[in-house]
Amino acid sequence: MRYLLILFLFVICTLPARAAKQPNIILILADDLGYGDLGCFGQQKLKTPRLDAMAKAGMKFTQFYAGCTVCAPSRSVLMTGRHMGRTVVRGNSVEPIIIRPGQSTLASVLKSAGYQTACIGKWGVGTPDNFTNPNDVGFDHFFGYINMWHAHNFYPEFLIRNGRVVKLKNEVAQKWKAFQDPAQPRAGRGVAVKRLEYAPDLFIEDSLAFIRKNQKHPFFLYFAMNVPHANNEGGNKGMEVPDLGEFARKDWPEPEKGFGAMIGNIDRDTGRILDLLKELKIAENTLVIFTSDNGPHQEGGHKADYFDSNGPYRGIKRDLTEGGIRVPTIAWWPGTIQGGGSDDAHWYFGDFMASASELAGAKAPAGIDSESFVDVLHGKEKVRKNPLYWEFYEKGSAQAVRFGKWKAIRQPMFTGKVQLYDLSSDPAEARDQAGEKPQLVKQAVSLMEKMHTPDPNWKVRGKRKK
C-alpha cells in the first residue's frame, strides 16, 4: 500500500511539472514591417502603444534577423530552421517549389510534442500546387492565403480553410476575374470593387477563436499577418484599409494614411491577443513573439523614408544591408521574462526551430542551422556560436554573412566584389573596410562558399569559384 501511495504521489507531482515545461507559443509575424516602424524601436510619427507596452513588459531583441529579405524564402527559413544556403524555398517563384510532406517544420515538431498547431493568415512559403500544403507539413488548422500573390488582395473573393475554398462577399474588378480560379498559381490576386470582408479582420477573429478553443492544452499559433504589405496590384492605391481612422485628417499622401492605419491595426490586434491570454489566465504559460518577415517595402504608393521605416539602418526590402533583414522583435512571457530588458546578441529566424523544440521538450530535427535562445528568455546571457548567412536571387543576386561583429556582402553571388562592415561601430554600413582587412574578406568568402549548397531550383549567373 505504501508503495502504491508513493507511486501515486510521484505521478501527480510529475504530470504538472511536464505541463509547465510546455508553454503555449504564439508567433506573430508582420509582413514588410521595418525595424523603425514601432515606437519601442524609435518610430516618431506613428503610435504603437500596445506593442510598446509589450516590449516594456517583455524584452526587445535589437539584433534579430529575418530569414531573407523577401517573404517566401524568409518564411521557408522560419519553418525549416535552415538558412538560405540550404532551405527549400530560396526566392519568390511561381513554380511549385515548396516544403513537402515528410520535411520537418516548426509546426510538425511541435505537433509531434503534443501541441495543437495553427497557421492563420499568409502562408506564402513558395507557390503550393494544392490547398492543403500548410496542413500537410504540420498545421492542424489553416485559414488564409496559400500563395503570396493572393495575400496582396485584402478584399479577396475567397480564402482557404483546411484545404477547402471559402467564398467571401468581396468582388474584384473585371480585369482581375481571370485570376479568381483557385487552382491557378497566382490565384486570388487583384483589386476589389466590392469590399465587404477585410481579410486581416477575419484573421484576428480566427486567431482569437483558436486560442479560446485550445486554452486547456499546449498550442502553437502562427499568426502570419499580411500587413503592412501593399496590394501591389493596386498601384499607388495599394495601402488598403477599411477605415483611415485618425489618419484621415492628416496632411499626408493617401498611401501614408493607409500605412499609418495598418500599423495601428497591427498594434490593436496584437493587444487583443495579449488581452485574451490574460482573460483566460494563461498568459504566464504563453510565450508570444512579435517580429517581421523582412525590412520595409516601398510599394503601393508608400515610401519607406516617409516614416523612417528602416530606422538607423541602410536599405529596405530586397537589400541584404541591415535595413532589409534586421527586424523589430519582441518577446513577452509574464512571470518568465523580466520586463523592460533587451538582448543585443544576434539571432535569426532559423533559431525559432531549436528554441521551440527546447520549450516543447521535443527533439530538434537533424541537420538544421538553428541555435536556441531560450536561455535569453530566462534572463541568462547567451551568444550565437555560428555565423548567419543569407542569399538573394533578385537584383542580380547577392549573398551576405555575419560572423561576430563583422558582416560581408557580395553582389552578385560568387563573382562580385566583397563589402565588409564592422557592425559594432558602423551599424549603418557606411564604411566599407574590405580594402583594409584582406584576411577578414578571405574568411568571409570562405564562409559564403561553405554555407551555400547548390540547388537545381535556384541558379544564378556566373560560376561559383573553386
Task: Give residue ranges: language-model regions.
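Formylglycine-dependent sulfatase
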Residues: 2, 8, 18-419, 423-466
